[in-house]
């Protein structure tokens, strides 16, 4: 059977449009007991399929991905399902077209008004579309979907924007790499694009939104971007693909998928396995040294992949992106747009369960919306206003209350706790009141017995209570603030002069949602009390490290020099 589904001389793989057809709106058939009835609503077609005059679409299915829905098959048995007449030119005369199982509307892919499936092994090899099967394929033929696209298609905005990357306007001959504008046109055959190959698919890396966090009053310094090594953590990234094949390629973002040093250490560790696979040499150039692809450990891979690797920014040429990605590439945010972006290459796993990415994205958005609403409801306008005013600079860190009129060394005085809070102080230190002196005499002898045995001990009259207003006036508290970069020894000595001090949070009990303030206070208290021991342990660790490095260097220098065959001299 000749190849079908060509448009402009380009064969379509995995999905083909083969013919135009019409259907009567009242044309239905009764759904009988089916051995294979998958749920194909999430089977997304490229947008060019919705613009072609050919309405009949054929797509290869995978039984381990598009599994049989036994519950739906039993429920819809006996229901009326839309159907259409298959054109005689689609299959040979000996094709068992009567074994097609037409599907209910709710189980059809988006944009289809009718469609059916041939189960695994139903179609013989000579009846299966050659565009959708490899020549070296062995075993029974995979299932096949044959559907009739609707005339008027209305897709959701999110799906429509996702399909925009496949839009190919008529008459557009320039294939421009979207991240690096260029005026050069390339006349090479566009069949080199990975999206048009039968063994590749192009994915979109979708990073799930991170949990909402309040803006920190302590701004971190700007980290200089580097391109020497690139190992991102992709465990929270979903790879959205129009159809699932063995190998998929996706452009990554250095902004949304930054380099993670812990992932780099994991790739160099011998204790953790990094699954590998052979990259096709006809697609990817041989990159060695710093430009070689880095294979990631299993725990840092996206869901549904058995092995994956990443090319760091600048390792692949711009010409490779233009010829291999072409018009199907989606622009991604990058820290440096003067070099080519990083690239993800993954091998899809056929053993694991299929991941419903659209449903997972929806659930994640619902979860983040609830968390955001809860966090925003717990904030007050004053808190948000204070954070917005002091987000760029922070002066204080810890406020100490003492009886001394002057602040200790390394601190500055403030008038009130409100002023300390506005300066950024989050913790306070106060002096604990001394407990009342208790009577240590034997509880078995009461006061009357003491007075009878020791008449010289007369009870002293209780002192008259002093005026509280006068006491507050005489003992005015002094508030001193320490900065975030203050000397910890000076801070500890000032706190030690209070004799008995209490460390607590300033203001609310939990001013920073999502942070264990009790644990943070315990760690700060431990640092203040045991700073000498911590320094000593750190010094011992550094000395041991230096000793091991010097020992390894000496052992390396003692190794005999091995000469190669070219250095050997025969006398």
Swiss-Prot record:
It comes from the Eukaryota. Keywords: Repeat. Residues 457-471 have a biased composition (Acidic residues). The keyword Ubl conjugation does not apply. Signal peptide: none annotated. Residues 440-472 are annotated as: Disordered. The keyword Manganese does not apply. Belongs to the DM7 family. This is DM7 family protein CG15332.
């Amino acid at each position: 059977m000749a190849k079908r589904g060509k448009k402009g001389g380009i064969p379509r793989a995995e999905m083909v449009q083969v013919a135009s057809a019409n259907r009567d709106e009242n044309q239905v058939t009764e759904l009988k007991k089916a051995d294979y009835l998958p749920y194909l609503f999430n089977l997304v077609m490229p947008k060019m399929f919705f613009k072609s005059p050919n309405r009949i679409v054929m797509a290869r299915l995978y039984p381990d991905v598009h599994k049989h829905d036994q519950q739906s098959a039993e429920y819809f048995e006996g229901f009326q399902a839309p159907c259409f007449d298959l054109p005689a030119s689609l299959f040979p005369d000996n094709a068992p077209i009567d074994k097609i199982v037409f599907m209910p509307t709710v189980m059809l892919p988006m944009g289809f008004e009718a469609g059916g499936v041939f189960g695994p092994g139903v179609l013989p090899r000579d009846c299966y579309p050659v565009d959708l099967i490899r020549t070296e394929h062995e075993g029974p033929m995979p299932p096949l979907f044959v559907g009739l696209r609707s005339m008027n298609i209305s897709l959701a905005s999110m799906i429509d924007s996702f399909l925009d990357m496949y839009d190919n306007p008529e008459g557009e001959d320039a294939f421009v790499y979207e991240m690096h504008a260029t005026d050069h046109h390339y006349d090479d055959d566009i069949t080199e694009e990975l999206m048009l190959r039968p063994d590749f698919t192009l994915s979109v890396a979708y990073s799930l939104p991170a949990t909402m966090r309040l803006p920190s009053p302590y701004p971190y310094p700007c980290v200089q971007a580097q391109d020497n090594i690139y190992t991102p953590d992709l465990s929270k990234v979903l790879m959205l693909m129009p159809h699932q094949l063995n190998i998929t390629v996706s452009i990554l973002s250095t902004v949304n998928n930054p380099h993670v040093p812990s992932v780099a250490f994991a790739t160099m560790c011998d204790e953790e396995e990094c699954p590998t696979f052979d990259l096709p040499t006809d697609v990817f150039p041989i990159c060695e040294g710093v430009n070689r692809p880095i294979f990631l450990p299993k725990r840092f891979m996206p869901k549904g992949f058995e092995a994956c690797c990443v090319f760091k920014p600048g390792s692949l040429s711009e010409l490779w992106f233009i010829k291999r990605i072409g018009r199907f590439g989606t622009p991604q945010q990058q820290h440096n747009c003067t070099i080519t972006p990083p690239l993800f290459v993954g091998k899809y796993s056929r053993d694991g369960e299929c991941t419903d990415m659209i449903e997972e994205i929806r659930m994640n958005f619902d979860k983040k919306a609830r968390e955001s609403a809860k966090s925003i409801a717990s904030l007050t306008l004053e808190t948000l206003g204070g954070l917005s005013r002091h987000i760029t600079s922070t002066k204080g860190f810890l406020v100490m209350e003492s009886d001394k009129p002057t602040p200790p060394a390394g601190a500055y005085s403030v008038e009130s706790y409100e002023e300390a809070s506005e300066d950024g102080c989050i913790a306070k230190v106060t002096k604990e009141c001394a407990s009342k002196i208790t009577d240590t005499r034997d509880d078995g002898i009461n006061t009357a017995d003491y007075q009878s045995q020791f008449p010289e001990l007369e009870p002293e009259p209780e002192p008259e209570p002093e005026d509280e207003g006068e006491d507050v006036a005489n003992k005015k508290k002094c508030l001193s603030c320490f900065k975030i970069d203050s000397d910890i020894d000076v801070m500890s000595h000032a706190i030690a002069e209070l004799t008995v001090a209490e460390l607590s949070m300033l203001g609310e009990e939990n001013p920073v949602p999502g942070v264990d303030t009790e644990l943070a206070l315990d760690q700060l208290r431990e640092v203040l009390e045991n700073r000498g021991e911590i320094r000593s342990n750190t010094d011992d660790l550094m000395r041991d490290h230096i000793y091991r490095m010097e020992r390894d260097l000496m052992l390396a220098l003692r190794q005999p020099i091995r000469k190669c065959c070219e250095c050997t001299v025969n006398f």
